[in-house]
């Protein structure tokens, strides 16, 4: 418990530190998508909701979201089926849709830095991530202080054919799983749609807008700005390294 209490204090200081950064004044018209639970800050269970009014069980995910191949990339782009538009998953989406379910100290910090309401500036996602670290420490302390061992270490089961779907919140955003098993309990099919791929189209959209705005600047600054824009989404493809190759043709 003392180690967790120290971690909570350090996490709170981290929020204050990240909130002091000088962020670019950028706003994007995001559609936020996240898991939601009325009684807790959703992480492992709940319904999939959006800032545009969507509210569905995880089993209906594929009825409302689609992955599409685009000519310029081998990465699939996730979009909303009804509009074909991009959407955002991750810490900004979770805080926008679930700030009321935060633990007391995390909720107070969100309110103090304007993240108790939707934030459309992707650069401030680092503050949202820091607030979620505070949330995690508060959750961990509660679990440790009130833990009661379960009657059994796992649920007993008998193999049979079936199909199931579920969604959880990974640090980077909504993570969708869909599995089918045969009568012997062996995997017949599996489909996983991770948060990085769901944000891929939105990342490219942001890059396009940024590049248009910064074209008058020099090539080095443009490349650095594009890298920063990608890292706002913490995609696993970048590992937060200098990876982006920018090819610029000027007329």
Predicted regions and their residues:
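Active-site bordering "gate/hinge" segments
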Residues: 1-172, 194-251
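Short beta-strand elements
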Residues: 166, 175-194
């Amino acid at each position: 418990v003392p180690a967790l209490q120290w971690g909570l204090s350090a996490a709170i200081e981290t929020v204050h530190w990240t909130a002091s950064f000088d962020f670019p004044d950028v706003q994007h018209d995001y559609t936020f998508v996240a898991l939601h639970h009325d009684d807790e800050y959703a992480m492992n269970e709940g319904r999939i909701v959006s800032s545009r009014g969507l509210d569905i069980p995880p089993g209906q995910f594929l009825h409302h979201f689609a992955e599409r191949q685009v000519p310029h990339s081998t990465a699939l782009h996730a979009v909303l089926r009804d509009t074909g538009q991009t959407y955002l998953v991750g810490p900004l989406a979770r805080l926008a849709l679930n700030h009321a379910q935060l633990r007391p100290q995390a909720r107070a910090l969100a309110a103090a830095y304007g993240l108790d309401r939707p934030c459309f500036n992707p650069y401030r996602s680092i503050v949202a991530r820091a607030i979620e670290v505070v949330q995690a420490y508060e959750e961990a302390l509660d679990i440790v202080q009130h833990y009661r061992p379960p009657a059994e270490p796992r649920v007993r089961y008998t193999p049979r054919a079936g199909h199931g779907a579920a969604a959880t919140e990974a640090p980077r955003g909504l993570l969708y799983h869909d599995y089918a098993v045969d009568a012997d309990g062996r995997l017949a099919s599996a489909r996983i749609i991770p948060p990085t791929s769901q944000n891929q189209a939105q990342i490219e959209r942001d890059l396009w807008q940024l590049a248009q705005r910064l074209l008058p600047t020099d090539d080095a600054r443009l490349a650095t700005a594009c890298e920063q824009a990608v890292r706002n989404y913490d995609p696993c493809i970048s590992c937060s390294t200098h990876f982006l190759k920018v090819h610029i043709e000027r007329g």
